[in-house]
Amino acid sequence: MGKMFSKIFGNKEMRILMRGLDAAGKTTILYKLKLGQSVTTIPTVGFNVETVTYKNVKFNVWDVGGQDKIRPLWRHYYTGTQGLIFVVDCPDRDRIDEARQELHRIINDREMRDAIILIFANKQDLPDAMKPHEIQEKLGLTRIRDRNWYVQPSCAASGDGLYEGLTWLTSNYKS
């Protein structure tokens, strides 16, 4: 019955996995979208899961900690994922190669082959932040031809770019 109402009234659900290196801004983004305000966060050990409704889409967002010790556990969250949000700490030029490796490890997993990919180029408000075109190049996105991906500049603290990213997800998700 619920699926019938969804088809009639346009409500969709989408399972989103939010990944990125530690301190990229994943949890700040999650709670900015959920609560509309900035919250003080601590490093995520384990995961946070919240439902965010935007434009008649219920996003079930799984924010899993980014510390290197728990990254091997990420794959346990892949099944059923329809969209990947990968958050990049744009001023952190020293770890962009590490971010690229982790991104490609995720998207090359067979469980993630159908997921669309949104990159939040985060912390655009900070000096020396890499711009979206630079993130696109450094993450090797132009070589990904068989997947739908997009780089959205963002600032988790202010909320800039976050809803534009969700708009891209809603426009590009095929249920």
Swiss-Prot record:
It catalyses: GTP + H2O = GDP + phosphate + H(+). GO terms for biological process: cell differentiation; intracellular protein transport; nervous system development; protein localization to endosome; regulation of dendritic spine development; vesicle-mediated transport. SMART domains: ARF, RAB, SAR. A lipid is attached at residue 3 (N6-myristoyl lysine). GTP binds at residues 23-28, 41-44, 63-67, 122-125, 155-156. Keywords: Cell membrane, Cell projection, Cytoplasm, Differentiation, Endosome, ER-Golgi transport, Golgi apparatus, GTP-binding, Hydrolase, Lipoprotein, Membrane, Myristate, Neurogenesis, Nucleotide-binding, Protein transport, Transport. The keyword Flavoprotein does not apply. A lipid is attached at residue 2 (N-myristoyl glycine). One of its GO terms (cellular component) is ruffle. It is a lipid-anchor. The keyword Transport applies. One of its GO terms (molecular function) is GTP binding. Its main location: cytoplasm. It is found in: Cytoplasm, Cytosol; Cell membrane; Endosome membrane; Recycling endosome membrane. It comes from the Eukaryota. Its EC number is 3.6.5.2. Belongs to the small GTPase superfamily. Arf family. GTP-binding protein involved in protein trafficking; regulates endocytic recycling and cytoskeleton remodeling. May modulate vesicle budding and uncoating within the Golgi apparatus. May contribute to the regulation of dendritic branching, filopodia extension and dendritic spine development. This is ADP-ribosylation factor 6. It comes from Xenopus laevis. The gene is arf6.
